[in-house]
Curated annotation (Swiss-Prot):
Regulation of catalytic or functional activity: Inhibited by sucrose.
Pfam family membership, one: Glyco_hydro_32C
Protein name per its UniProtKB record: Fructan 1-exohydrolase
Family according to the record: Belongs to the glycosyl hydrolase 32 family.
Reactions the enzyme catalyzes: Hydrolysis of terminal, non-reducing (2->1)-linked beta-D-fructofuranose residues in fructans
Catalytic residues identified in the record: D78
One annotated GO biological process: carbohydrate metabolic process
Amino acid sequence: MAQAWAFLLLPALALASYASHLLLPAYITTPLCGGGDGARSFFLCAQAPKDQDQDPSPASTMYKTAFHFQPAKNWMNDPSGPMYFNGIYHEFYQYNLNGPIFGDIVWGHSVSTDLVNWIGLEPALVRDTPSDIDGCWTGSVTILPGGKPVIIYTGGNIDQHQTQNIAFPKNRSDPYLREWIKAANNPVLRPDEPGMNVIEFRDPTTGWIGPDGHWRMAVGGELNGYSAALLYKSEDFLNWTKVDHPPYSHNGSNMWECPDFFAALPGNNGGLDLSAAIPQGAKHALKMSVDSVDKYMIGVYDLQRDAFVPDNVVDDRRLWLRMDYGTFYASKSFFDSKKGRRIVWGWSGETDSPSDDLAKGWAGLHTIPRTIWLAADGKQLLQWPVEEIESLRTNEINHQGLELNKGDLFEIKEVDAFQADVEIDFELASIDEAEPFDPSWLLDPEKHCGEAGASVPGGIGPFGLVILASDNMDEHTEVYFRVYKSQEKYMVLMCSDLRRSSLRPGLEKPAYGGFFEFDLAKERKISLRTLIDRSAVESFGGGGRVCITSRVYPAVLANVGRAHIYAFNNGNAMVRVPQLSAWTMRKAQVNVEKGWSAI
């Protein structure tokens, strides 16, 4: 069991006397916690602090995000059917009209012109027919020929069996598409074939057109004990026939929720429209939500056999690729025809307690929408926040030419530490001190982040950011890298360690982490971007190779209203920072109940 580690500030006079010998004129580092030999390190092995005896009011609005998508109140979960249509972005989502806990699910609906500011509308779909009386659950939107959007969604029927249902906009001339009419022949799909699990049949994908001109879509399900994305065909999007075989299945995993299937060209950050012809050289991504995380495979879609063939067949699902290594689930992507890109959202649930959610009156949010594309080598997906989010940046702070030696902290001042966007490049002065990589770490990178935390010095790293830090450092979150040398390549571990993120009791405070390959022999810079939005933190490492979403609830946010951000290095090798930029993020207008009535 790994110990918890703490920052510990030296007294002010000790800091002043020690800082006088530092030879870094461009900035001042804050060295913390020294050994008897005079060497300084900002980490000190310590017992984990006790949780506060008195909870600092979890109902505080301080934990409500300023620029993430969430309703004004109550429970939300999966993104459902995001789309761009006639100049408007639509975000549908699983929503409980009646409270901040799961249940009574309908389709919430919001619209935007910029993916940043959102108008909340009345629910698009409610539970009012026999085929969805138990809930209007996750689904997708497909744009049919002639510019006709159609929703296909999972409904829970009166027997609590899961069915697939269709709805069309009542008035396509309404720019907001406020009202939707359910098809008379709903449900269009039932789990009534032999071997199908009637309560594990949900979350239809966006449709795509095959070489025969017929529509296809996939639905998450269980068939004869196998987890699969079940495949269906239709000529008119109303009458569907199950294809004999799923495009891909696996017998060693739990049911695949929220499947997503899309094409991408290696190295091209433009998206591909599934309703159009797929160009030569394109690959496909098959994503599934399983084991409480979103995983995916890259491969080739065999059009003749309607089969997905992964580039690498991996039986151990712990080694499957991950969309995000943190609190991120049920993601849904769509093709943005306005800018020719693919955008993905994920649901980030709360990691405080249900009683906290009841007190707050809200639970759940969606991650910042991300552009998603296939890396040039065709091996993995890359993600980056959409450029529109940068419109909220203000009060830019820049630093160049920093050098971080072992134990150095550099405070990033003059930005709001609770609402910030930080971009930093780390340049390795040497790669000779990289420690050997153990391939078994790939099975559980979170465990390795916990055992080799930021307080444990390494050869190269840990280096990164300390965010949401209280004055005395008894609360802080660490986002950082470690570099390892494999036989023929370098492996970078990215961690987001929440174990000391809050003194509040009853919280989940894990150490998240994931590995990515990096050609450090050619490129010595590793980038990190972290967006801090009160209780939501999203970090993107190595240009989007690893993404980690974290939910944090520091007491300092509710009690003090002041926190700090630092860049740090605790590795033996010196790390340069050629560029550091940070911004305060303004508050977006997101589903406010009053005060914003038009786009």
